[in-house]
């Protein structure tokens, strides 16, 4: 791998960069920091790659909601946890779907499948505001459609089993739920930044499967920890889609938690990556 180069996509935006790979990328002097994405990029609107990226986000989030909501309903329908896949199975469904969908869509849209991930990458200037807003809209629409198809196939069961809607469990306060969502999303978005870091990818020869695997595993672990508290949101589109289709008061009572928490967690992860891990503000001064 000595002396070779490859195109490395930064985060999940459309700006490739030519970087050395393997042993030739070990030195900081061999790495060039990619330019920040522009805030507004009207030219994207005329590009098919822009529109197909949004379609990929829509389909991925649609499939994500369809599989995961069905899994949650299957567990709730069982007479006891031993008769179903249980919390571990739900966590595997969420983590496994993220692993598969990020792997499938990373080369097209970056494989966000989550408004919090998109927001964090936008704050780190990995993609434009134009693309970020478009992604979030398509993710939410995909989530609504995914939950809607589940309800269309099983209307009675969907309403009786809660429709996979996120709520704060009895015995926990709104503060506890908010904290769980903030920290859970921080873990996820921090993992996304680390797994898609252009410098690390260049140094490690950018093996494609290395990014989806830790991201999916992070989702799995966060679900194990926070399902008993909030049912695990960490994805505003997932929470919104289930809440809209279920459409009961208890699904909306604490719905703000599943937007505010993930966005705060994503913002903290973006700041931590940019300021502490990459020290970009300090590099620009020197």
Swiss-Prot record:
- Give me the Extracellular side stretches, as residue ranges: 76-81, 154-174, 230-256
Example GO molecular function = channel activity
Which stretches are transmembrane?
A: 55-75, 82-102, 133-153, 175-195, 209-229, 257-277
UniProt short sequence motif NPA 2, positions renumbered to this chain: 235-237
Which residues does the entry place in the Cytoplasmic compartment?
A: 1-54, 103-132, 196-208, 278-286
Which tissues carry this protein? Widely expressed. Expressed in roots and above ground.
Q: Where in the cell is it found?
A: Cell membrane
Q: What is its main location?
A: membrane
**Motif NPA 1: chain residues:** 114-116
Q: Name one GO cellular component term.
A: plasma membrane
UniProt entry keywords in alphabetical sequence = Acetylation, Cell membrane, Membrane, Phosphoprotein, Repeat, Transmembrane, Transmembrane helix, Transport
- N-acetylmethionine PTM positions: 1
UniProt induction comment:
By blue light and abscisic acid (ABA).
Q: For the modification Phosphoserine, which residues carry it?
A: 284
Q: Which Pfam families match?
A: MIP
> Where would one find coiled-coil regions in this protein?
none
Report membrane topology: Multi-pass membrane protein
Q: Where is this region: Disordered?
A: 1-34
The similarity comment for this entry is: Belongs to the MIP/aquaporin (TC 1.A.8) family. PIP (TC 1.A.8.11) subfamily.
Q: Quote the entry's note on domains.
A: Aquaporins contain two tandem repeats each containing three membrane-spanning domains and a pore-forming loop with the signature motif Asn-Pro-Ala (NPA).
Summarize the protein's role.
Water channel required to facilitate the transport of water across cell membrane. Essential for the water permeability of the plasma membrane and for the morphology of the root system. Its function is impaired by Hg(2+). Inhibited by cytosolic acidosis which occurs during anoxia in roots.
**This chain belongs to which protein, by name?**
Aquaporin PIP1-2
